[in-house]
């Protein structure tokens, strides 16, 4: 029987049978993998820890006729702080939905995996704004997938005067006020938002989250990211709507 040893993070789980669990793993070696974790829901199972949602583990998988079976798993990072906090878990669930849609079976996506893990680490271990972490994740994910918008200058004339920029969803990048013409769907953005977008798209992964923005700029990033993502991925992600419900409860 063939086996595969790979690190990966659980991005989806479905209970099956009396005590089994089918998990979807975002793996380093094979992209998306579906695997059966037999008995993983039993409290004393050696698989119970490493097969939980958001657990990043080292897996040994046996390849069966229809899917892999989990033979063993050793936890590398459990992201317990996220799973134990409803608000953080909601942000993480939003990112998991996106990841589950864009990765493919037998298609390694190491840069996307690193982005996802870094985003979860920031969400779990720092006091950075969860919403900013998510917006950075969304924009950088699209860029990594090949949908990077042109955000270093006006896509038409090359102007770098960021205080008069619009984000064109038709042109997939910046247009200055002189080149805007009849692009009625373009979104006027501030200099701060323009610089933030440029940073997110072009910065090194190690420095991706090392900046802060005002609430108004974060709101602009959200408007760009949500619409750009909806048009490129052809889906409207709604899990973050639950955050508004939580905010109302807190008030």
UniProtKB/Swiss-Prot annotation:
Pfam families named among the record's database cross-references: RecO_C (PF02565), RecO_N (PF11967)
The entry's keywords: DNA damage, DNA recombination, DNA repair
GO annotation (BP), single: DNA recombination
Spans traversing the lipid bilayer: none
Gene3D superfamilies for the chain: Nucleic acid-binding proteins, Recombination protein O, C-terminal domain, Recombination protein O, zinc-binding domain
Any GO CC annotation of this UniProt entry: bacterial nucleoid
Function description: Involved in DNA repair and RecF pathway recombination.
Family: Belongs to the RecO family.
Protein name, as recorded: DNA repair protein RecO
Gene: recO
């Amino acid at each position: 029987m063939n086996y595969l040893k790979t690190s990966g993070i659980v991005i989806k789980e479905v209970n099956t049978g009396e005590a089994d669990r089918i998990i979807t793993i975002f793996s380093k070696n094979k992209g998306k993998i579906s695997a059966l974790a037999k008995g993983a829901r039993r409290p004393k199972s050696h698989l119970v820890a490493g097969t939980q949602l958001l657990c990043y583990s080292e897996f040994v998988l046996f390849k069966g006729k229809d899917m892999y079976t989990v033979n063993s798993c050793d936890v590398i990072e459990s992201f317990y702080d996220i799973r134990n906090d409803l608000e953080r878990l909601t942000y993480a669930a939003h990112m998991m939905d996106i990841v589950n849609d864009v990765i493919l079976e037998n298609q390694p996506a190491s840069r996307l995996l690193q982005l996802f893990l870094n985003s979860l680490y920031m969400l779990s271990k720092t006091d950075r704004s969860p919403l900013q972490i998510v917006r950075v994740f969304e924009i950088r994910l699209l860029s990594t997938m090949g949908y990077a918008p042109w955000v270093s200058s006006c896509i038409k004339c090359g102007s770098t005067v960021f205080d008069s920029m619009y984000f064109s969803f038709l042109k997939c990048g910046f247009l200055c006020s002189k080149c805007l013409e009849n692009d009625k769907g373009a979104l006027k953005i501030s200099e701060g938002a323009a610089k933030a977008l440029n940073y997110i798209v072009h910065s090194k992964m190690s420095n991706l989250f090392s900046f802060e923005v005002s609430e108004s700029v974060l709101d602009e990033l959200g408007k760009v990211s949500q619409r750009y993502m909806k048009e490129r991925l052809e889906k409207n992600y709604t899990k973050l709507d639950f955050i508004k419900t939580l905010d109302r409860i807190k008030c």
